[in-house]
């Protein structure tokens, strides 16, 4: 059996995470939530806390901004990855201008994950459907 992959995409703050969480809970009693965000400012802290509060005890929460393939998972589990866009950004920031190395690392991790018989619900951003930042990323 191969991996089942479900993509959930939409604009910034469009309800993607809630939609994906509800889908995961319909598929299994205790899904795995693989969070990729890093808390770098107060806004992100509030958003992460809201996500944690919403999930509570039914979820097994794993926070991994980079090494998602190292997560201990049992065959057949439902895994929500939130968010693929942030995860990719984390790799690009970590490796700087070495785009080829970042892409190779991401591909290796996804190949490792998707080689398992699990269901993945992957949240990603539809770039261009969200707001425009008032300041440059650093």
Task: Please report, for each region that a protein language model flagged, where it lies by residue.
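SAM-dependent methyltransferases
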Residues: 1-3, 78-81, 104-111
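Conserved P-loop
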Residues: 2-73
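Generic beta-sheet signal
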Residues: 4-8, 31, 77-86, 118-122
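Short amphipathic alpha-helical segments, especially helix-boundary/capping motifs
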Residues: 24-26, 42, 83-86, 121-126
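Helix-adjacent hinge/juxtasegments
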Residues: 54-102
């Amino acid at each position: 059996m191969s991996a089942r992959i479900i993509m959930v995409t939409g604009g910034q703050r469009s309800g993607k995470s809630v939609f994906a969480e509800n889908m995961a809970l319909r598929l299994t009693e205790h899904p795995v939530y693989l969070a990729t965000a890093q808390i770098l400012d107060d806004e992100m802290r509030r958003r992460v806390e809201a996500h944690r509060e919403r999930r509570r005890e039914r979820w097994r929460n794993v926070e991994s901004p980079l090494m998602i393939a190292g997560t201990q998972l049992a065959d057949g589990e439902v895994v929500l990855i939130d968010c693929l866009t942030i995860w990719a950004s984390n790799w690009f920031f970590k490796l700087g201008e070495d785009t080829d190395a970042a892409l190779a690392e991401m591909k290796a991790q996804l190949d490792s994950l998707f080689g398992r018989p699990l269901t993945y619900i992957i949240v990603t951003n539809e770039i261009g459907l969200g707001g425009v930042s008032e300041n440059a990323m650093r």
